[in-house]
């Protein structure tokens, strides 16, 4: 049987000196001191010491976790990682901390996911697939986030957000791209932001975009000048026209417009 010989208050913890035990001194938080009525001359067995140290891991873990979540909402996985990074290494005690905080609704992955999704919808910047990937990196389970997305981010809302993004892209690139290029860019951009092809297509169709023939031809002639310079160095005649036609078609210009432009085009020498 050992005995507590001294207790000293430090900045954050208490140093407890022991005699006749394997440990000569231990460091405990105030919660542990109070919970076990730690006082000088109190007798402590090795079994008592193990219990005290186990509880202290829980108490310190809970204190750290409460500090961590005081700034903003955190997921259970984020809190677990934070505790491990701050030397709370007893996994059983970590899970107990998470259990207590979850029971008191201080950690709620579903609420976290719902708030995150609503924020992204409000910002109008992300589709469901992008949101899902971000939440997965925060340790939220696939089941929890799938349920939250289903409840909050309906297809109707997705189309509304995608439409606003598509409209903005149309205003930005409308005069710089052909109609085909613009449509391709809008679809690709929306899918990169996490919208399905189906939702992206519906949003695009809702814009009812039409070609500006004069702008299309201006863009064609501008691109024709660039392509002609490149291919005139190594090709001539029919082969050159074929190379140029193929290059312009890949950029979204129609074969009829390309043929019309080439008919009276003067190639650089």
Swiss-Prot record:
Cell compartment(s), UniProt: Cytoplasm
Keyword annotations: Cytoplasm
GO cellular component, one term: cytoplasm
UniProt main location, coarse: cytoplasm
GO annotation terms (biological process): regulation of DNA repair
Pfam family, one: RecX_HTH2
Cited PANTHER family: REGULATORY PROTEIN RECX FAMILY PROTEIN
Similarity section: Belongs to the RecX family.
Matching NCBIfam families: PRK14135.1
Cited function: Modulates RecA activity.
Protein name in UniProt: Regulatory protein RecX
The species this protein was found in: Lactococcus lactis subsp. cremoris (strain SK11)
Protein's gene: recX
């Amino acid at each position: 049987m050992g005995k507590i010989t001294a207790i000293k208050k430090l900045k954050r913890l208490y140093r407890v000196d022991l005699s006749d035990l394997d440990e000569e001194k231990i460091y405990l938080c105030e919660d542990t001191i109070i919970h076990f009525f730690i006082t000088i001359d109190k007798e402590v067995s090795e079994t008592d010491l193990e219990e005290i140290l186990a509880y202290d891991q829980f108490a310190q873990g809970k204190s750290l976790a409460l500090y961590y979540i005081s700034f903003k909402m955190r997921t259970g996985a984020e809190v677990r990682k934070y505790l491990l990074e701050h030397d709370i290494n007893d996994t059983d005690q970590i899970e107990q901390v998470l259990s207590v905080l979850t029971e008191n609704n201080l950690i709620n992955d579903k609420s976290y996911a719902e708030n995150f999704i609503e924020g992204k919808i409000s910002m109008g910047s992300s589709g469901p697939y992008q949101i899902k990937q971000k939440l997965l990196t925060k340790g939220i389970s696939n089941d929890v986030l799938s349920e939250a997305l289903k409840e909050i981010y309906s297809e109707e809302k997705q189309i509304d957000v995608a439409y606003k993004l598509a409209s903005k892209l149309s205003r930005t690139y409308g005069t710089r791209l052909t109609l085909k290029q613009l449509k391709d860019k809008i679809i690709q951009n929306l899918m990169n932001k996490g919208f399905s092809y189906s939702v992206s297509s519906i949003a695009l169709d809702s814009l009812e975009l039409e070609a500006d023939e004069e702008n299309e031809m201006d863009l064609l002639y501008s691109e024709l000048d660039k392509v002609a310079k490149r291919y005139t160095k190594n090709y001539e005649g029919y082969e050159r026209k074929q190379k140029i036609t193929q290059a312009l078609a890949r950029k979204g210009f129609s074969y009829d417009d390309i043929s019309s432009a080439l008919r009276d085009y003067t190639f650089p020498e």
